[in-house]
């Protein structure tokens, strides 16, 4: 465990050092007195801002194809930064882009700042992207210096992913069940990044806690492990002196994250699945002021033809009595303004997020409601001669859902419901195997989590390739041609065959240039010393014997 060196002194005893808090970990009392809360931000809003910033980093990094370690590192930077600064001073989306930009360089998966900003622009609306100012790149670059000074240049961060895979290899039992447990625990780690667990506990303890939670939900009790005789519980071989209460507290914090999504799911599904019924009650709200639309319609009817009026009467008989006037689309703007204004007033008076989410959820999925309006256009087109005038009005009705956020005085209070929709699919080259970006925070993910809690054999994806060692495959044996029958592998190879112009005896005699025995020996004089042949003068020199001393000196 890394200790806080700033707060420790040499005089502190070893017993006190064991209880010294790590430099990047706080208790719940400290988390209740963050700079944001000291400036008047309530804890629920701060938790929502942290969740939205983490999901923003997760979604941007996933679309850019970054590794899960890079995403987790950026989110850890994000949480640590706001332990020293307030959300009111530093917008969360600019900080999230800066943290992802720095994490990419630290984890050796860098991305250009303009690419991060471009991806952020595709995820945020105009009001949310307005936090980046006129020069988004300059905003990120300036904030990077503040981020580095805030985290004290402590850039290396460990994550529960590596410990989760390491611990899973030490478990014994059914491999399929262990694989399901690891897959589920991996998803819990992804979702735990949206909480402050990384500011409370080490990654080793979080890895054990998510395995404990996954085992409880999968109804898989870990009974066999490698060091079972030495330890009473399976997690004691990985982390010691961790009681069950700590694991239970971590599990409850993760489940509380899903309980918030469960409360908002009933408001989220009707907007997507039951869009036509939601369009019908809208004209019912202003039934009292129907006289105003009727006056507007009467004012617009004189320049029209009688055929148009007859067509309108036919539509009124064919359709429900709730939709008798298809033309009051201009007054419909005033109706929506009346409906939106009380919501804004309620939001100004009630800071908790639940009243905001139903309204915001309709801003992000504009694609599903784009299909019902074409069903309503055909009855209006034959009835009205000026279809071009009605078309833009109805198309403007769709962006009207996005108009309320700009009217809001505080743009920070208009976040996208990122935690309540599944992240975008990663590119094909992102991971070969399990999708490491899975989450139970979306509507579909929470339903699958509920089904897994009821059934014993849930369906999971494949494990990441690094979770278990791959099967050892013997190397392929090369198919050489069989040796000839007379081949002797122990016999030394023959000497290289030289060209025919160089005649070399096949087996030269031992020695250095010794003549053969039949060579006639030279004659030896009586003195015993063989005569020395005269030296051969170099070419162009006169014989030495013809030169005397006097001639040589000349």
UniProtKB/Swiss-Prot annotation:
Q: What is this protein called?
A: Cyclin-K
Region annotated Disordered, chain positions: 262-554
Compartments where located: Nucleus
Chief place where the protein resides: nucleus
Q: Which residues does this entry mark as bearing Phosphoserine?
A: 325, 329, 341
Q: Which organism is it from?
A: Mus musculus (Mouse)
| Residue stretches of biased makeup (Pro residues) | 402-428, 466-542
Phylogenetic classification of the source organism: Eukaryota, Metazoa, Chordata, Craniata, Vertebrata
GO MF, one term, reads: cyclin-dependent protein serine/threonine kinase activity
């Amino acid at each position: 465990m890394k200790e806080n060196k700033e707060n420790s002194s040499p005089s502190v005893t070893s017993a006190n050092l064991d209880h010294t808090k790590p430099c990047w970990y706080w208790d719940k009392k400290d988390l209740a007195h963050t700079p944001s809360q000291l400036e008047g931000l309530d804890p629920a809003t701060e938790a929502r801002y942290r969740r939205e910033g983490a999901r923003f980093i997760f979604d941007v990094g996933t679309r850019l194809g970054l590794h899960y370690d890079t995403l987790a590192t950026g989110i850890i930077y994000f949480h640590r930064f706001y332990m020293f600064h307030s959300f009111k001073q530093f917008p969360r989306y600019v900080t999230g882009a800066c943290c992802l930009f720095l994490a990419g360089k630290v984890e050796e998966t860098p991305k250009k700042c303009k690419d991060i900003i471009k991806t952020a622009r595709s995820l945020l609306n105009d009001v949310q992207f307005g936090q980046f100012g006129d020069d988004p790149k300059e905003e990120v670059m300036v904030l990077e210096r503040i981020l580095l000074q805030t985290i004290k240049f402590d850039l290396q961060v460990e994550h529960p992913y590596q410990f989760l895979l390491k611990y899973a290899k030490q478990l014994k039992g059914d491999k399929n069940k262990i694989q399901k447990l690891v897959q589920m625990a991996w998803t819990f780690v992804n979702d735990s990044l949206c909480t402050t667990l990384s500011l409370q506990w080490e990654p080793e303890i979080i890895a054990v806690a998510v395995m404990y939670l996954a085992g409880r939900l999968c109804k898989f009790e870990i009974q066999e492990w490698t060091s079972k005789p030495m330890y009473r519980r399976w997690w004691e071989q990985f982390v010691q002196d961790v009681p069950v209460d700590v694991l239970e507290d971590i599990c409850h914090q993760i489940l509380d994250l899903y309980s918030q999504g469960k409360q908002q799911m009933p408001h989220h599904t009707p907007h997507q699945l039951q869009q036509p019924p939601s369009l019908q009650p809208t004209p019912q709200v202003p039934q009292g002021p129907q006289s105003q639309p009727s006056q507007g319609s009467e004012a617009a009817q004189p320049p029209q033809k009688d055929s148009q009026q007859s067509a309108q009467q036919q539509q009124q008989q064919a359709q429900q009595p709730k939709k008798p006037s298809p033309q009051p689309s201009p007054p419909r703007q005033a109706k929506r303004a009346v409906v939106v204004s009380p919501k804004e007033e309620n939001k100004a008076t009630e800071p908790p997020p639940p009243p905001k989410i139903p309204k915001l959820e309709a801003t992000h999925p504009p694609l599903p409601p784009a299909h019902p309006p074409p069903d309503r256009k055909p009855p209006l087109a034959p009835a009205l001669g000026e279809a071009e005038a009605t078309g833009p009005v109805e198309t403007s009705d769709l962006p009207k859902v996005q108009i309320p956020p700009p009217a809001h005085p505080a743009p920070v209070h208009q976040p996208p419901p990122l935690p309540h929709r599944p992240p975008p699919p990663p590119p094909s080259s992102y991971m070969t195997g399990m999708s490491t970006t899975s989450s139970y925070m979306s509507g579909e993910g929470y339903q699958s989590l509920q089904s897994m809690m009821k059934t014993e054999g849930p369906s999971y994806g494949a494990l990441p390739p690094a979770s278990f060692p791959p099967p050892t495959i013997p190397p392929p044996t090369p198919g050489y041609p069989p040796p000839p029958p007379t081949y002797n592998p122990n016999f030394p190879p023959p000497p290289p065959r030289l060209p025919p112009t160089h005649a070399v005896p096949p087996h030269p005699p031992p020695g250095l240039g010794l003549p053969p025995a039949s060579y006639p020996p030279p004659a030896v004089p009586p003195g015993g010393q063989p005569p020395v042949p005269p030296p051969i003068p170099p070419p162009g020199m006169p014989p030495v014997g013809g030169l005397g001393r006097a001639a040589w000196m000349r």
